[in-house]
From Swiss-Prot:
Pfam families: Cytochrom_C. Electron carrier protein. The oxidized form of the cytochrome c heme group can accept an electron from the heme group of the cytochrome c1 subunit of cytochrome reductase. Cytochrome c then transfers this electron to the cytochrome oxidase complex, the final protein carrier in the mitochondrial electron-transport chain. This is Cytochrome c. Its main location: mitochondrion. The lineage of its organism: Eukaryota, Viridiplantae, Streptophyta, Embryophyta, Tracheophyta. Heme c binds at C23, C26, H27, M89. The gene is CYTC1. The modification N6,N6,N6-trimethyllysine is found at K81, K95.
Length: 112
């Protein structure tokens, strides 16, 4: 598997479209927005998995204790259930490196 360092440059505008079509039904990014089926992603970068206040995570997510940043998100978004066995996230992943890079570029700007 290629790493984030080898990924194409991400486009946040394209990433926003990906978020709206594949992620927004379960996640929010705005500060203070509530949780949906998945946790609010505001403040995602630098946060440990399974630690967002007010959201009930699976044991797998809590125990993985990964710190979310470009490399970990890039690997996770390829196949969430393989990266964190037992995760509640039902999304099958983004197989295309460009889509993952675009989504990460958007998340870096929208969750800060």
């Amino acid at each position: 598997m290629a790493s984030f360092a080898e990924a194409p440059a991400g486009n946040p505008t394209t990433g926003e479209k990906i978020f709206k079509t594949k992620c927004a039904q379960c996640h929010t990014v705005e500060k203070g927005a509530g949780h949906k089926q998945g946790p609010n992603l505001n403040g995602l970068f630098g946060r440990q998995s399974g630690t967002t206040a007010g959201y009930s995570y699976s044991a797998g997510n809590k125990n993985k204790a990964v710190i979310w940043e470009e490399n970990t998100l890039y690997d996770y978004l390829l196949n969430p259930k393989k990266y964190i066995p037992g995760t509640k996230m039902v999304f099958p992943g983004l197989k295309k490196p460009q889509e993952r890079a675009d989504l990460i570029a958007y998340l870096k700007t929208s969750t800060a």
